[in-house]
């Protein structure tokens, strides 16, 4: 890819589990955007060198590889515990992948990967208001001594109550305001039945 002139800030690579230290340094130097898909990686590909990639100064975000059952909360947990087991235990380093680092990968890292880190990925003046609200008044979240750690370790997609995209509320109190969920489920079921009939 380097010889072809492809490595650069407009390249987004997924998984990144087979990279050598030289590859990591080169990709970081060229500004390549990288995404890890932890569940898919562990199921099929292997352990990514996430700590080394971050140490090299590369942009690293989280994805779910298109897997519908997954969500960003699951991906953060899987990567955290995989990194602790694979990279942390041998060196007796239980914080090889910290919760603030994972939250940044899930937010700013994803925005950077899309090439929109200047307008998305963090709550700052001048950036688009893309936010989710969590119900933290629940026994698996509260009380919390460190909310960032608790969100990464304990929160899940069911805790999301509201979603705001570019300042517009699209989900309020777990009700999607912009789509007909019942109709979508009905259509999905109908199409699935048609696919099954054709397959057998």
Describe the function of each predicted region.
Residues 104-200:
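Active-site microenvironment of metallo-dependent hydrolases
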Residues 15, 36-37, 62, 134:
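Conserved beta-strand positions
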Residues 1-33, 45-60, 118:
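Histidine/acidic residue-rich metal-binding segments in metalloenzymes
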Residues 38-43, 65-68:
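Short, acidic/turn-prone active-site loops that include or flank metal/cofactor-
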Residues 13, 65, 167:
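Residue-level signal for inorganic ion chemistry
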Residues 16-17, 84, 137, 168:
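Flexible loop residues that form catalytic
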